[in-house]
């Protein structure tokens, strides 16, 4: 039986790295796909390259999609401030990037169909990540329908399937799985700020560091002080 091919959206963060490693564990030939979208934290692209090399991915592509050209998010607009006050329940945060996952998944599906890949691997997490509308199960279900209807492969009955194994997991479980799989957590990048070191105070750093402490790995926290 031929090895299944999967396209993994690889941001350079912990979640996407863990999802890619899970696909490899399932026996997939994994192709990584990363995006320079004008994000202030471009440091994550270096992390994505390191993760791809560590996992020995079959291919790794970086695509330029300048969503920062029109801003609309604290991650792409230097005039907006990245929040450090914690996640506010029921409020979509200013770190939401308009249309980001829709654009990324669409490009991922294009690559998947071109490569004959059976699935598209996503590291989205609806439980911990601030309630972004494009990280939720209903969004993924709707996009799967779109993917099936909008592609030649889908119309022929063998279109790529969206696979988001982390979508209902706690961040602590993701850390535990990353450790089990040998994901190079120290090489991943989750911080929203544009500095050379994680800030330790943005929402993403807070969630990550809390999970690392719960998993007994404070040495991997932003400030490595536990």
Swiss-Prot record:
It is an enzyme of class 6 (ligase). This is 7-cyano-7-deazaguanine synthase. Binds 1 zinc ion per subunit. Its EC number is 6.3.4.20. One of its GO terms (biological process) is queuosine biosynthetic process. Zn(2+) binds at residues 191, 199, 202, 205. ATP binds at residues 10-20. It comes from Synechococcus sp. (strain CC9902). Pathway: Purine metabolism; 7-cyano-7-deazaguanine biosynthesis. HAMAP family: QueC. Belongs to the QueC family. It comes from the Bacteria. Keywords: ATP-binding, Ligase, Metal-binding, Nucleotide-binding, Queuosine biosynthesis, Zinc. It catalyses: 7-carboxy-7-deazaguanine + NH4(+) + ATP = 7-cyano-7-deazaguanine + ADP + phosphate + H2O + H(+). Its cofactor is Zn(2+). GO terms for molecular function: ATP binding; ligase activity, forming carbon-nitrogen bonds; zinc ion binding. Catalyzes the ATP-dependent conversion of 7-carboxy-7-deazaguanine (CDG) to 7-cyano-7-deazaguanine (preQ(0)). InterPro entries: QueC, Rossmann-like_a/b/a_fold.
